[in-house]
């Protein structure tokens, strides 16, 4: 995959930090509701990190904390060695340009064709000759297998193709960190397999780091280097997919195996069933 040119510096390169991003003792709440309490997560450089957990545990909120769209109540969110809370507006925008984002719905611009959807970030943020821009866009589309679809409109694409176009757009600025929000949602098995392979292959080919928020345990376990399971505002387990499958926690066991009942119960709390049936004071 071709990368956009970057100016060469005179200084000798220094060894990059082990973590491209980290959340340290993060507390966060919305409207008085606690989302995270003392959250600790490390996104290691060059790896695919999975963020999993039941619905409503704040997985997408975590991505917004990393990008600075939300600010933690306490603790630190660090990206590329810098505390996000301490960045000014210009520095924050510069940081976001080094982060790619694949949204669950793809978020393609319906009035632009595939080529212009992928070209959009370059036209907004880079002053490139048209020929160079064209070559970069085509190379990214080629990387996701859709160079031949450059002139199609979003309405002509399948769900899987739309997701791949959005992925090409997410990598067009050569990000150092790529964030995926439920990338497999709504995809058929073939499309899911294609996106799964692309997440791993692009991560390795581009030398980037990836964070994948997902419920799809079986699929992400095939490619993730490390995984975190969130529940109750905290990390309840972390490790490789193999380590999580052997984890002793009942919550982790229920989630990894997709069990209908367990710590997360099947029945919503209710009075004793026979007693409720006999209670004439309750309305229907």
Which residues does each PLM region occupy?
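Catalytic Walker B motif of ABC-type/P-loop ATPase nucleotide-binding domains
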Residues: 178-181
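Conserved ABC ATPase signature
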Residues: 153-157, 161
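Conserved catalytic motifs of ABC-family nucleotide-binding domains
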Residues: 174
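ABC ATPase nucleotide-binding domains
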Residues: 257-284
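The feature captures the beta-strand-to-loop junction immediately N-terminal to the Walker
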Residues: 52-54
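Conserved ABC ATPase "signature" region
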Residues: 82-83, 130-148
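Helix-to-loop junction immediately C-terminal to a conserved catalytic motif
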Residues: 67
